[in-house]
Amino acid sequence: MAGLKLQAVTKSWDGKTQVIQPLTLDVADGEFIVMVGPSGCGKSTLLRMVAGLERVTSGDIWIDRKRVTEMEPKDRGIAMVFQNYALYPHMSVEENMAWGLKIRGMSKAHIEERVREAARILELDGLLKRRPRELSGGQRQRVAMGRAIVREPAVFLFDEPLSNLDAKLRVQMRLELQHLHRRLRTTSLYVTHDQVEAMTLAQRVMVMNKGVAEQIGTPVEVYEKPASRFVASFIGSPAMNLLDGVISASGDRFELPGGLALPIGADYRGHAGRNMTLGIRPEHIALSSQAEGGVPLTVDTLEILGADNLAHGRWGDQKLVVRLAHQQRPAAGSTLWLHLPEHQRHLFDGETGQRV
């Protein structure tokens, strides 16, 4: 197995604006890292730099303790799996999986051994003579993974490999990818815009925004302790409720427009008068009552999801979403009294967006 290291890596197209700002990342041997973020955040550019398909403006890339910054892609010990499968339509499954080894001059017996083993792992044994047009989307993606596996790379690079699949098949392929990584334990760098993929597949998640790694941590860490307002808004479905306000002069209240306020147990006197954003996830809001000092939410709409429901409404001028149990279906226009537990709240600096 091999590790991957990015050391102060940057990318600029025009020599002025950095689309990837200085980024350092250590990926341990056998670790599965997922880069997630919105379109244009730089995640695919970074993956292509690791692959050698884009030049690094500054910084270094190391694979298996070897500096590969200027190496050709074929010499880096990587294998890529793409969104569009990139299979040769005129070749069989077996030929597609073997082609990369064949052009490298590997012996026929060795190629056959690797292809058979990869086919067994991916349950493609009975499909080796078929052409890509005879396969389902999930089967084609497994062939693309098989072609990467036979190379026995130091690092797997996945570029949104599940994006072309329907919702049901994506769930199935996520499970297959988890199983595959447990078997192979190959260092993997995976790019997606889908936070569900990121949270379910990753050992660590790197949340990217405008060329910056906003947070690198386990799925639990980025969910429970988002490092910034951006991470808080991006990770979680539905998104975290974010309320803009100000810390009171006494440091013990969070004041919102329209005369609304929430007590804050911790002493924030050092931040008195500063603009802040208070966040709380819809699933962390509890039902309460007026007598218990609950926050009144006027329900606008209700989304019935099956296992649970989402109530969208207003507290004064503030929009809030709360996750409710399946049997709780408040009508539009009704009032819910809510409790926002202090230990589930998050505060972010109003200017920098960083966690306080």
From Swiss-Prot:
Binding site for ATP: G37, P38, S39, G40, C41, G42, K43, S44
Pfam families: ABC_tran (PF00005), OB_MalK (PF17912)
Keywords for this protein: ATP-binding, Cell inner membrane, Cell membrane, Membrane, Nucleotide-binding, Sugar transport, Translocase, Transport
GO cellular component terms, semicolon-separated: ATP-binding cassette (ABC) transporter complex, substrate-binding subunit-containing
Main location: membrane
Domain ABC transporter stretches: 4-235
Reactions it catalyzes: sn-glycerol 3-phosphate(out) + ATP + H2O = sn-glycerol 3-phosphate(in) + ADP + phosphate + H(+)
Record-listed E.C. numbers: 7.6.2.10
SUPFAM superfamilies: MOP-like, P-loop containing nucleoside triphosphate hydrolases
Membrane topology: Peripheral membrane protein
Top-level taxon of origin: Bacteria
Record GO biological process: carbohydrate transport; glycerol-3-phosphate transmembrane transport; glycerophosphodiester transmembrane transport
Gene Ontology molecular function terms on file: ABC-type glycerol-3-phosphate transporter activity; ATP binding; ATP hydrolysis activity
Gene3D superfamilies documented for this protein: 2.40.50.100, Nucleic acid-binding proteins, P-loop containing nucleotide triphosphate hydrolases
Magnesium keyword on record: no
Subcellular location: Cell inner membrane
PANTHER family: MALTODEXTRIN IMPORT ATP-BINDING PROTEIN MSMX (PTHR43875), SN-GLYCEROL-3-PHOSPHATE IMPORT ATP-BINDING PROTEIN UGPC (PTHR43875:SF12)
UniProt subunit comment: The complex is composed of two ATP-binding proteins (UgpC), two transmembrane proteins (UgpA and UgpE) and a solute-binding protein (UgpB).
Family of the protein in this entry: Belongs to the ABC transporter superfamily. sn-glycerol-3-phosphate importer (TC 3.A.1.1.3) family.
NCBIfam families: PRK11650.1
Function: Part of the ABC transporter complex UgpBAEC involved in sn-glycerol-3-phosphate (G3P) import. Responsible for energy coupling to the transport system.
Full protein name: sn-glycerol-3-phosphate import ATP-binding protein UgpC
UniProt source species: Salmonella typhimurium (strain LT2 / SGSC1412 / ATCC 700720)
